[in-house]
Amino acid sequence: MMDEQGLDGMQILPGSQDSFSELWASVQTPSIATIAEEFDDHLGNLLQNGFDMNLFELPPEMVAKDSVTPPSSTVPVVTDYPGEYGFQLRFQKSGTAKSVTSTFSELLKKLYCQLAKTSPVEVLLSKEPPQGAVLRATAVYKKTEHVADVVRRCPHHQTEDTAEHRSHLIRLEGSQRALYFEDPHTKRQSVTVPYEPPQLGSETTAILLSFMCNSSCMGGMNRRQILTILTLETPDGLVLGRRCFEVRVCACPGRDRKTDEESSTKTPNGPKQTKKRKQAPSNSAPHTTTVMKSKSSSSAEEEDKEVFTVLVKGRERYEIIKKINEAFEGAAEKEKAKNKVAVKQELPVPSSGKRLVQRGERSDSD
């Protein structure tokens, strides 16, 4: 049965091929040359009507966000620049008591603060800055021989801290939007916080600075003077204003401020101070003279045998006491020499009943 059906299919195959040929011949297809022209016309209409010519152009705000901030200079500028927005800083007034944790000297333009203690700084502007403006704080060394070095925390304080920015000296407290940066070219570290307009009833905006290392820390500042540069910048890094002030991180800000202010006011009378310091050790001289006098009052034999030791604090006092001792010794030597000369000049005493006749004098018998 299967074979019969297969044979029947083979018998009708030629007929089916004839039918397909007739069908293919009946299909109307354009030539290849006309297809290319029609496609070009259709594509041109599509690009002209529905294609956005600005598809690959980014909006200006996206270009600003993706742009790279130009590298900062090796030697930072430390001069004040209020700019068109009248950028100013104000510090809270505080005295020189030992209990204060932060105090600012208007005379020296210098901030004294304790380690890791917040120091409020008020920012005052004459008009509203551009949208997205930020405040940046950077620490640099004051003296020219150290200005190229990067200000960092000492290794001891870094190991005690677990924060990601533990190497940064300056921190901005009280804001979750503070960002810490390190310049890839100069390796200088800075911290930024968005500028916030003053609250109702106030004309200033306050930020909280804290310094995480003492000025005397070995391996860190190592007693080198530092400056804090506070700048008002656009999101692109363009500086709109700049203010600089010196900072000393110490254990007793009030005491150090008072000492520095007193020394600065006495600077013109510096030579007089040195004279007073040189004369001060003379107060201890009477004690040494009493010792020397007690020695001179004793017999000559005891003076030669006994040795006294006087403990002196300070090189200047030692030199003064040494000169006094040398003067006494010189006087003693002169006294001894004078006594020897006097003994030699003494005339021999004649025996009893006789009188010594001087040269050129006649005796009674003559």
From Swiss-Prot:
Ranges annotated as biased composition (Polar residues): 280-292
Residues flagged as site, Interaction with DNA: 98
Keywords, in A-Z order: Activator, Apoptosis, Cell cycle, Cytoplasm, DNA-binding, Metal-binding, Nucleus, Phosphoprotein, Transcription, Transcription regulation, Tumor suppressor, Zinc
UniProt-annotated stretches for the region Transcription activation (acidic): 1-41
Compartments reported by the entry: Cytoplasm; Nucleus
Presence of keyword Nucleus: yes
GO function terms (MF aspect): DNA-binding transcription factor activity, RNA polymerase II-specific; metal ion binding; molecular condensate scaffold activity; promoter-specific chromatin binding; RNA polymerase II cis-regulatory region sequence-specific DNA binding
Free-text comment on the cofactor: Binds 1 zinc ion per subunit.
Annotated segments matching region Basic (repression of DNA-binding): 341-362
Chain intervals for the UniProt region annotation (Oligomerization): 305-336
Alphabetized CDD domains for the sequence: P53
Biological-process GO terms, alphabetical: apoptotic process; DNA damage response; positive regulation of transcription by RNA polymerase II; protein tetramerization
Signal peptide start and end residues: none
Entry's Gene Ontology cellular component terms: cytoplasm; mitochondrion; nucleus
Swiss-Prot/TrEMBL cofactor(s): Zn(2+)
InterPro entries: p53-like_TF_DNA-bd_sf, p53/RUNT-type_TF_DNA-bd_sf, p53_DNA-bd, p53_tetramer_sf, p53_tetrameristn, p53_tumour_suppressor
Binding site for Zn(2+): 154, 157, 213, 217
Domain of life per record: Eukaryota
Residue ranges the UniProt entry marks as DNA-binding: 80-267
Motif Nuclear export signal mapped to chain: 319-330
Region Disordered: start-end pairs: 255-305, 332-366
Domain notes: The N-terminal and C-terminal disordered regions undergo liquid-liquid phase separation (LLPS) following homotetramerization and activation. Post-translational modifications, such as phosphorylation or lactylation affect the ability to undergo LLPS.
Subunit structure as annotated in this protein's UniProt entry: Binds DNA as a homotetramer.
Record-stated family: Belongs to the p53 family.
Protein name per UniProt: Cellular tumor antigen p53
Organism: Platichthys flesus
Gene designation per UniProt: tp53
